[in-house]
Amino acid sequence: EGLRIKVGRWNVAGKPIVILVDFSTFITQKDEIFASFWEKYKLDSISGQWDYIEPALFGYAAGKVIESFVRFNSSIRQRIIAQFHEWMTGAGLLYLKSAMPQVGCVFTTHATVLGRCVAGNNLPLYSEMKNYVPEELARRFNVISKQSLEKTAAHQADCFTTVSEITATECAHFLDKEVDLVTPNGFENVFTPSEAEWEGKRKAGREKFLQVAQAILGRPVAEDALILGISGRYEFKNKGIDVFIDAMGQLNRNNGLGKEVLAFILVPAGHAGANKELLHNLELPYQAVTSTDLYLTHYLNDSANDPVMNRIRAQKLRNSEEDKVKIFFVPSYLNGDDGVFNMPYYDLLVGMDLTAFPSYYEPWGYTPLESLAFKVPTITTTLAGFGLWVKEHYNMNHPGIEVIHREDGDASNVAT
């Protein structure tokens, strides 16, 4: 059949069978494939660039593989369900709808193309949503093909779901389709430390944060310092990184602050490796040199124009000895070999005293949920799906989480 696959086991709990699909053989057939989708579904692929073409072809190839698997490995009595996540896999759903309609197709979106565009471009999403015309927005942000695939998949699916009530509202407006079901996100609690391990892991994570802070500054920090963090993708406004930094600036100006605060921004960005002065100080803490960069663990590309660094400067967070709040930017993936921490993210998370995720656009929000799983108190907002879920299911204050009300235009209030 010309399908190129590799079959193995996914290295997660349960070790499920996984099929890796190579879609590259379909690149030369892309015009015929997209023409067929236009004729059957009016899917508008004409303006799609490679960031549309490649995922669409992957989805198509995945649909072909599912068709082949069902034909050769299932009986007529078996009920087969294929679940497609996000617009990037939607072409597979469309292929199966016509080629093998007996397969039940679920389409799950974890955000919307237009919602992410609006929020990411500093436009008011929630207060103005009903005034936005989806077709005009798609043209404005040059995402006509992505929007078309997302909308078409939602309408053609046998069951359309999303991860939160707040995203269900987006779907109804931008995709002109009510979801059939809201399926809140979650995870198997198999990667959190056991009761016996927790104390040791927390101590190791905390010690690492203190060591790195001292190595960056070239001077000691308080042993009882409050360690605070934010993490996630580098979406400056959507993830509330701007609000986090503003809050640290306000906290630093609070004369009543009695404890030193070490604030870590764990957000991957372009960088050129670990800061050598920092590494020297980690190796030889008693011969510490004063770093030329008091914020960064790694050499950040274009630091002068970086939004995080510019916001830190604007808040006059200088990391001087007099400052009660010290803020650090870790622009590296924390997978155990970043060159500075050399510990996986979760082994560091457990060492924090508090996390804060003051999100503006967050269809669900795993990060505060992960914090709770690791027994770290957390802060989120009512614009995060998880935050809304907590508000709905807990009528009283929860000891581990604070959900701050957030809406369009109130970033300064949220920071306060």
Residue ranges, per PLM feature:
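Catalytic cores of nucleotide-sugar-dependent glycosyltransferases that transfer UDP/GDP/TDP-activated
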Residues: 1-416
